[in-house]
């Protein structure tokens, strides 16, 4: 009887233990269900977050593509600007060479002009000498005319001195003829010198016109150089702006790459956490 009671107590104890284990199993099952539901909620949230991350990744990919296109466009603009600068440099060099040649021609023209001015001065001095000689000849002619008048007066007053006066008159007339010939020669020489002076003056005017033409051409070259210089400055500004744009785009790309790398790490961490959750669910 004692053995039966003892066995009953043991059975009762086993029953209580079984009930405790059943309650504990139910509690664990309930906890497992709650944990499973929590994991399912977390999984749904992670899937939603993962979808948002994928959308954001697509957006970043599109932004990266746009940035790359802008970078290529900026590189093309910078290359075009550099090519334009090189072309302008070549044009400026050609203009400078042409300007040097024009300055050389202008210097030659100025030298010829100076020589022509010297020749004109010499011609003017020669004309003054001729004028002085002609003036002296005229004075001499006037003196001879006075002498001729005196001789005629003496011939009228004294017939006895007729022969002597006639002889003197012949001499004076001969001198007068020679003087007239010299005067005519001086006048002819003066005409020649006037013609030469006229030619020198025309040459001088031609050289002055040519010098004025060179001066206008030089002003034109200076204006072209100024225009090319302004274009060069504009091209340099465009090139600098393109370089700044490229630097800005490179920084934007670097930032996007850093953010993309961070999102990849975040995605990897979420994937690992999701794998752990799935493993926990599988083990339960």
From Swiss-Prot:
Species lineage: Eukaryota, Metazoa, Chordata, Craniata, Vertebrata
UniProt remark on domains: The molecule is in a coiled coil structure that is formed by 2 polypeptide chains. The sequence exhibits a prominent seven-residues periodicity.
Positions of post-translational Phosphotyrosine modification: 261
Coiled coil: 1-284
Gene name per UniProt: TPM3
Record-stated family: Belongs to the tropomyosin family.
Protein name as catalogued: Tropomyosin alpha-3 chain
Gene Ontology CC terms: actin filament; cytoplasm
One GO molecular-function entry: actin filament binding
Oligomer and partners: Homodimer. Heterodimer of an alpha (TPM1, TPM3 or TPM4) and a beta (TPM2) chain. Interacts with TMOD1. Interacts with TNNT1.
């Amino acid at each position: 009887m004692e053995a039966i009671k003892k066995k009953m107590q043991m059975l009762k104890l086993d029953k209580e233990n079984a009930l405790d284990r059943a309650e504990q199993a139910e509690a664990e099952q309930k906890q497992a269900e709650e944990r499973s539901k929590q994991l399912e909620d977390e999984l749904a949230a992670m899937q939603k977050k993962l979808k948002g991350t994928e959308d954001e990744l697509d957006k970043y990919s599109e932004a990266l593509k746009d940035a790359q296109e802008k970078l290529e466009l900026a590189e093309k603009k910078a290359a075009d600007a550099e090519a334009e600068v090189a072309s302008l440099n070549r044009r400026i060099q050609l203009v400078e060479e042409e300007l040097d040649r024009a300055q050389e021609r202008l210097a030659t023209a100025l030298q010829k002009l100076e020589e022509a001015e010297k020749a004109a001065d010499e011609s003017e001095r020669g004309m003054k000498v001729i004028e002085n000689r002609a003036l002296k000849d005229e004075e001499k002619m006037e003196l001879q005319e006075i002498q001729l008048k005196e001789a005629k007066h003496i011939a009228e007053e004294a017939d006895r001195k007729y022969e002597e006066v006639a002889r003197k008159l012949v001499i004076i007339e001969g001198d007068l003829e020679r003087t007239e010939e010299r005067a005519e020669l001086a006048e002819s020489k003066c005409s020649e010198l006037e013609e030469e002076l006229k030619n020198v003056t025309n040459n001088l005017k031609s050289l002055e016109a040519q010098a004025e033409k060179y001066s206008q051409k030089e002003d034109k070259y200076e204006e072209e150089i100024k225009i090319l210089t302004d274009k060069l400055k504009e091209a340099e500004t465009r090139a600098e702006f393109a370089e700044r744009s490229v630097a800005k785009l490179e920084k934007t790309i670097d930032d996007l790459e850093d953010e993309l790398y961070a999102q990849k790490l975040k995605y990897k961490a979420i994937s690992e956490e999701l794998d752990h959750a799935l493993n926990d669910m599988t083990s339960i």
